[in-house]
Amino acid sequence: MSAVWMDEQVESSARVQNSLKIEREDHKLEKRLCREVGRAIVDFNMIEEGDKVMVCVSGGKDSYAMLDILLKLQKRAPIRFDLIAVNLDQKQPGFPKHVLPDYLGKLDVPFHIENQDTYSIVKRVIPEGKTLCSLCSRLRRGILYRVAGELGATKIALGHHRDDMLQTFFLNMFFAAKLKGMPPKLVSDDGKNIVIRPMAYVPEKDLTRWAQVRDFPIIPCTLCGSQENLQRKQVGNMLREWEKKHSGRLENMFSALQNIVPSHLMDSKRHDFKNIRTTGVADAEGDKAFDAEEFSEPQRPGLSVIDIASR
């Protein structure tokens, strides 16, 4: 047997092995996404029996992934609920209006395209060079709330993920002087809708990879995506740099959002500092005066789950 023939066999075998490895990794990613979305739904009671969930699909990777995973979970869920995909066509120049209807039409899910020219309003009202996101978001929110009522939706699902929630927390702290984040579930500001974020536990890197696996027809935003100096982007870059230098830090920060100790902050509306009294009973959470705080290495709970699942 010639060396050339043997080399070709080795290369062919390597390609097959590599293909199988990629397939296994993709399958693990799918299981992880379904598990994390399912866990968030259960932890926060996001979807209940008989719900009609309006899934907001923008054409970005996050909303595509949310719809994709919710459709998978719908088939195996212990309760019955309906999904309807909704896209708001804001009449942005160059927006490929056929992409979403074509994509959604191939799925086993009802969908609605809402046509509203918010682009012209935003460009007319906001001075050149100013951030467009605030007004665009308000207009979009009001329209989606109205559409939810017209469609009889009981929940509105948005595609925000773990990184979005962390960014929002730091944005509020840096620029609004508030310890306030992005909730996984909350009544909308009009008091008429319940907004849920099923991907609250999902890191953005998993969604980026899943978009590649599924080959979603991504539609870039010509408004938000074209503004490079947005505060959110700056905070996002900061968090990514932290994670690069200190692996596991984002996981710990996200866990901190679920582990709040009001007595160790300074908000007198959350803790009655004025009327505290001694009890004579030892308390591990009591003040330790001059003792230096001791911190363990980041546990990275999300990654430990992944490692266990991959064995």
Swiss-Prot record:
Binding site for [4Fe-4S] cluster: 133, 136, 224
Pfam family, one: ATP_bind_3
Cofactors (names): Mg(2+); [4Fe-4S] cluster
GO cellular component terms, A-Z: cytoplasm
Cofactor comment text: Binds 1 [4Fe-4S] cluster per subunit. The cluster is chelated by three Cys residues, the fourth Fe has a free coordination site that may bind a sulfur atom transferred from the persulfide of IscS.
UniProt enzyme class: transferase
Family annotation (CDD domains): TtcA-like (cd24138)
Note: The thiolation reaction likely consists of two steps: a first activation step by ATP to form an adenylated intermediate of the target base of tRNA, and a second nucleophilic substitution step of the sulfur (S) atom supplied by the hydrosulfide attached to the Fe-S cluster.
Membership in a protein family: Belongs to the TtcA family.
The protein, known as: tRNA-cytidine(32) 2-sulfurtransferase
Organism of origin: Polaromonas sp. (strain JS666 / ATCC BAA-500)
Classification of source organism: Bacteria, Pseudomonadati, Pseudomonadota, Betaproteobacteria, Burkholderiales
GN (gene name): ttcA
